[in-house]
Curated annotation (Swiss-Prot):
GO molecular-function terms, A-Z: translation release factor activity, codon specific
This protein's encoding gene: prfA
Name of the featured protein: Peptide chain release factor 1
Origin species: Yersinia pseudotuberculosis serotype I (strain IP32953)
Function: Peptide chain release factor 1 directs the termination of translation in response to the peptide chain termination codons UAG and UAA.
Modified residues (N5-methylglutamine): 235
Pfam families in UniProt: PCRF, RF-1
Keywords recorded for this protein, A-Z: Cytoplasm, Methylation, Protein biosynthesis
Family assignment from sequence similarity: Belongs to the prokaryotic/mitochondrial release factor family.
Amino acid sequence: MKSSIVAKLEALQERHEEVLAYLGDASVIADQDRFRALSREYAQLTDVTRCFKEWRSAQDDIEAAEMMLDDLEMREMAQEELKIAKARSEELEQQLQVLLLPKDPDDERDCFLEIRAGTGGDEAAIFAGDMFRMYSRYAETRRWKVEIMSASEGEHGGYKEVIAKISGDGVFGQLKFESGGHRVQRVPETESQGRIHTSACTVAVMPAIPEAELPEINAGDLRIDTFRSSGAGGQHVNTTDSAIRITHIPTGIVVECQDERSQHKNKAKAMSVLGARIRAAEMQKRQLAEASERRNLLGTGDRSDRNRTYNFPQGRVTDHRINLTLYRLDEVMEGKLDMLIQPIVQEYQADQLSALSEQD
């Protein structure tokens, strides 16, 4: 391992001890925001320092085994020990490289999850509902909170569009690779001939940014319309114009919110989603520029992005970005998403490592 990397790891080890001391300080404990931030940093540093200690232990084992090679009686055993220690050292070095990759500052944030029905009419809306249920189940397994911000229900079930805020530890970092197009192949309940139909929906995952960090939105750039809240089939939820539609004129971004009875609450929710969408659009531009010369696994939420196909007759789900196919569709739809998320996270990390080595 490069001496510069070892020096960086030694500095992180010192920081780990420093943060531990802070966490025992009464003034830090009294400041909940600082205590929470330091606790997160401590957890991240703990993984790095543990791995670094194990790597150093492997180096000691290599050194000891090499010294034993000169002893004829011990040589065979020493060669075996050297082989094991070197393999362990290489494995730990790879783990350390991943742990040292630049962290996306948004990874620890909550997120907004948007699911929109695409081609396929009623079946697309039903599939969007199935997708929302899948993500909600996944959130339950990770003890995350799901709050619907806005929903437009389909006439025969599901959603034309649903926006939810998902809160918890590391939500955006875990879900950000879900952005893009999702396609379903199955026989709709309304299909009398038993023919397989293809429908689609798009998913967009955006970090939920605190109000103070959101891009400044000029009030003159907004058109705000109020209308009467309605449920599926036009049935009125209430008789006041409490629903809000906000249009950001420069970008054409439109956000509707009608889930709350209070117009003020609907406007606050809509503004938070609008701010996240504007920021996400800016980030997307930047990502496209940076990724022009290499593939980008981070979906843009664009309809042209084809992330996955969910084939119900075959019980198959395929992630087209990494050519991964699993015949475990029932489990996936019940929210067991780690089997799909982890491989793409690993692929993304491998791409990052490759990009860093090219810079070196």
